[in-house]
Amino acid sequence: MLTIQFLCPLPNGLHARPAWELKEQCSQWQSEITFINHRQNAKADAKSSLALIGTGTLFNDSCSLNISGSDEEQARRVLEEYIQVRFIDSDSVQPTQAELTAHPLPRSLSRLNPDLLYGNVLASGVGVGTLTLLQSDSLDSYRAIPASAQDSTRLEHSLATLAEQLNQQLRERDGESKTILSAHLSLIQDDEFAGNIRRLMTEQHQGLGAAIIRNMEQVCAKLSASASDYLRERVSDIRDISEQLLHITWPELKPRNNLVLEKPTILVAEDLTPSQFLSLDLKNLAGMILEKTGRTSHTLILARASAIPVLSGLPLDAIARYAGQPAVLDAQCGVLAINPNDAVSGYYQVAQTLADKRQKQQAQAAAQLAYSRDNKRIDIAANIGTALEAPGAFANGAEGVGLFRTEMLYMDRDSEPDEQEQFEAYQQVLLAAGDKPIIFRTMDIGGDKSIPYLNIPQEENPFLGYRAVRIYPEFAGLFRTQLRAILRAASFGNAQLMIPMVHGLDQILWVKGEIQKAIVELKRDGLRHAETITLGIMVEVPSVCYIIDHFCDEVDFFSIGSNDMTQYLYAVDRNNPRVSPLYNPITPSFLRMLQQIVTTAHQRGKWVGICGELGGESRYLPLLLGLGLDELSMSSPRIPAVKSQLRQLDSEACRELARQACECRSAQEIEALLTAFTPEEDVRPLLALENIFVDQAFSNKEQAIQFLCGNLGVNGRTEHPFELEEDVWQREEIVTTGVGFGVAIPHTKSQWIRHSSISIARLAKPVDWQSEMGEVELVIMLTLGANEGMNHVKVFSQLARKLVNKNFRQSLFAAQDAQSILTLLETELTF
């Protein structure tokens, strides 16, 4: 027997999706494989998803896999690589508490006296629709069905039918939906799930309906006892597949409570299963109120992926009497507004306008090329493993793919992918990219990424073993097939080739020879292909660092694989808990190595990127910019934040930071240096076109202040528009800011404003400012930083003096557009 010991790396514990993936990995072997959770002293058949879930395994639990059988050595090698490298990817990223914390109710809403019910935010957003109550199904009628001689046959038929339905949905879905449906399919195909139902029928003589329900109750009770919220919330998945089985078995008894949404609807239910959610017309699903759903349920994951706002914590009996009435579900402030009046509806129309502006601006920002504050260009690219990930990466602002892990095509299968399959996969991502560069890393297999059909013998130290470019000569046919596929696809886009695990010049010379042979073959075969291709290497073996100058004669670029390079440089296994604290790329030795690579490559006109985890770490971005890297490639969700941060950094200041870091004596000194590093704040003018509006159709004072504060949030002048608005209202309550002549000047000095601003809205028609000075049709809002030297009283006074001048006022009211107002104010005012 062989054993793999590890700490559970899953933040949410061993729930349905990772259990399904682990079961799939284990099921391909003849050996018996037992999963053990040592904290719980729980054992499970690793080829059963349900048994794995039942171990109650949480993050960082001490676990092991015991493997015993004829193929135990090969199984251990492959499963160890899976546990160490890919197991964590089967978990899902959950929203932070900050993302699920409701904003305090803004004054611009509370002053309108809305009829509100308060709940808890589960998925952020705002939805407007009709409240519709969905009653829960009762299972009592199924439990009462007597046992029948046909029950066993019925069970097998229902399981097969449900599996067929799920497989059909899998063919039609992608993303989170596909992942969750796969987990459900795994559960119904699980021997333990169906076996328990059969035992209840044979040993306890229960009818099929009662056996399905009793099995559901037993499994749910075990999950409900878990210490993990995430595992407790898998109860919904067990209930979902069990109820589907019941409805398939007796469709005539009672149709499932499916709802047809014919107009925008806010759905109110005790709970909603994933399959019920997927059956809804999402175009008309404005939001959901779910009484008992937790923040990590699969239904919530689907809702967030579909941008459906969700609240909980509202008792159904408190909402039932409002069924059929219009409402606004505000999952930003955590409220449900019942029967909103015109003023409340107007508030949410303004909120939607701001949300649309924000979404448009984010899309524009993502599409912009990445520059530092002083216009130093740096490419921001994505790391992906399949062509399906490419559109999402580009939507996040990826300017290309810095690492396409082609080995994913070779893994988890019985035979190698042929040339046509590879060509189609590579062509798909190139077509999605347009003219964006795609760097294909040739197959990094062998060693820690064992491929059974290659029959590479087991190694004592696979991370330092027979892998990547080292295996290519033995498997030259396999490598040539990949080269042919990439060269064919390269004729459809900007393809580049990167070779992993290179340690010497002879390897790259051999590869270049193979590329030329592949080109000759493709010409001979009359297949469309690229005549040349940009070639680079992964810099992950320390020996390469000392001969970068020689490699510059043979390749076009370098990409530093910081994960493996860190391990090899320090001789540290990052998966070994006894030495993993030593795994830290931010040390003087590592930074000096990066500096040497970049300097040598740049001297010879070659570019250098980084494609390990380090590339997406925002804390270390100033160092990477300062070291002169030309490209950062990272997980695509990190791209928007990295681009935004980069725009705030001055490359010269970062270069000095990197120089100082390389002179430090320890990692602790570098961390202290980073903590003390404060990027110079970009300076924005007090007056700017982005904050000036004409002919705004506001119906009240509240909408004007709401819009102007919210717009400052959209434009990045504040990260806290709700808090800034509160400061404006507090000043407004001391004395109204109407100054006469149809003008109001709301103002505040606030800690929540990042860039002091003057915002202007000239209204389409006057509004009541609740002031003795009469109605207002021009709003000039001053928001100055609390710690800035600018005196808001002086600014206010200068504006007031100008407004006394009739000609100045008339010019403001007569201005044709926002630019005319800006030009007038810049001419007349001095701050």
Swiss-Prot record:
<dbReference type="InterPro" id="IPR050499">
    <property type="entry name" value="PEP-utilizing_PTS_enzyme"/>
</dbReference>
<dbReference type="InterPro" id="IPR000121">
    <property type="entry name" value="PEP_util_C"/>
</dbReference>
<feature type="active site" description="Tele-phosphohistidine intermediate; for PTS EI activity">
    <location>
        <position position="298"/>
    </location>
</feature>
<dbReference type="Pfam" id="PF05524">
    <property type="entry name" value="PEP-utilisers_N"/>
</dbReference>
<dbReference type="GO" id="GO:0016020">
    <property type="term" value="C:membrane"/>
</dbReference>
<dbReference type="GO" id="GO:0005737">
    <property type="term" value="C:cytoplasm"/>
</dbReference>
<feature type="modified residue" description="Phosphohistidine; by autocatalysis">
    <location>
        <position position="298"/>
    </location>
</feature>
<dbReference type="GO" id="GO:0046872">
    <property type="term" value="F:metal ion binding"/>
</dbReference>
<dbReference type="GO" id="GO:0008982">
    <property type="term" value="F:protein-N(PI)-phosphohistidine-sugar phosphotransferase activity"/>
</dbReference>
<feature type="binding site">
    <location>
        <position position="540"/>
    </location>
    <ligand>
        <name>Mg(2+)</name>
    </ligand>
</feature>
<keyword id="KW-0762">Sugar transport</keyword>
<dbReference type="GO" id="GO:0009401">
    <property type="term" value="P:phosphoenolpyruvate-dependent sugar phosphotransferase system"/>
</dbReference>
<feature type="active site" description="Tele-phosphohistidine intermediate; for PTS EIIA activity">
    <location>
        <position position="747"/>
    </location>
</feature>
<feature type="modified residue" description="Phosphohistidine; by HPr">
    <location>
        <position position="747"/>
    </location>
</feature>
<feature type="domain" description="HPr">
    <location>
        <begin position="1"/>
        <end position="90"/>
    </location>
</feature>
<dbReference type="GO" id="GO:0016301">
    <property type="term" value="F:kinase activity"/>
</dbReference>
<dbReference type="InterPro" id="IPR040442">
    <property type="entry name" value="Pyrv_kinase-like_dom_sf"/>
</dbReference>
<dbReference type="InterPro" id="IPR023151">
    <property type="entry name" value="PEP_util_CS"/>
</dbReference>
<dbReference type="GO" id="GO:0008965">
    <property type="term" value="F:phosphoenolpyruvate-protein phosphotransferase activity"/>
</dbReference>
<dbReference type="InterPro" id="IPR015813">
    <property type="entry name" value="Pyrv/PenolPyrv_kinase-like_dom"/>
</dbReference>
<dbReference type="Pfam" id="PF02896">
    <property type="entry name" value="PEP-utilizers_C"/>
</dbReference>
<feature type="binding site">
    <location>
        <position position="441"/>
    </location>
    <ligand>
        <name>phosphoenolpyruvate</name>
    </ligand>
</feature>
<keyword id="KW-0460">Magnesium</keyword>
<dbReference type="InterPro" id="IPR002178">
    <property type="entry name" value="PTS_EIIA_type-2_dom"/>
</dbReference>
<dbReference type="InterPro" id="IPR035895">
    <property type="entry name" value="HPr-like_sf"/>
</dbReference>
<dbReference type="Pfam" id="PF00381">
    <property type="entry name" value="PTS-HPr"/>
</dbReference>
<feature type="binding site">
    <location>
        <begin position="563"/>
        <end position="564"/>
    </location>
    <ligand>
        <name>phosphoenolpyruvate</name>
    </ligand>
</feature>
<keyword id="KW-0418">Kinase</keyword>
<feature type="domain" description="PTS EIIA type-2">
    <location>
        <begin position="685"/>
        <end position="828"/>
    </location>
</feature>
<dbReference type="InterPro" id="IPR036637">
    <property type="entry name" value="Phosphohistidine_dom_sf"/>
</dbReference>
<feature type="active site" description="Proton donor; for EI activity">
    <location>
        <position position="611"/>
    </location>
</feature>
<dbReference type="InterPro" id="IPR000032">
    <property type="entry name" value="HPr-like"/>
</dbReference>
<comment type="similarity">
    <text>Belongs to the PEP-utilizing enzyme family.</text>
</comment>
<keyword id="KW-0808">Transferase</keyword>
<feature type="region of interest" description="PTS EI">
    <location>
        <begin position="119"/>
        <end position="650"/>
    </location>
</feature>
<keyword id="KW-0598">Phosphotransferase system</keyword>
<comment type="function">
    <text>Multifunctional protein that includes general (non sugar-specific) and sugar-specific components of the phosphoenolpyruvate-dependent sugar phosphotransferase system (sugar PTS). This major carbohydrate active transport system catalyzes the phosphorylation of incoming sugar substrates concomitantly with their translocation across the cell membrane. The enzyme II FryABC PTS system is involved in fructose transport.</text>
</comment>
<dbReference type="Pfam" id="PF00391">
    <property type="entry name" value="PEP-utilizers"/>
</dbReference>
<protein>
    <recommendedName>
        <fullName>Multiphosphoryl transfer protein</fullName>
        <ecNumber>2.7.3.9</ecNumber>
        <ecNumber>2.7.1.202</ecNumber>
    </recommendedName>
</protein>
<feature type="active site" description="Pros-phosphohistidine intermediate; for HPr activity">
    <location>
        <position position="15"/>
    </location>
</feature>
<feature type="modified residue" description="Phosphohistidine; by EI">
    <location>
        <position position="15"/>
    </location>
</feature>
<dbReference type="InterPro" id="IPR008731">
    <property type="entry name" value="PTS_EIN"/>
</dbReference>
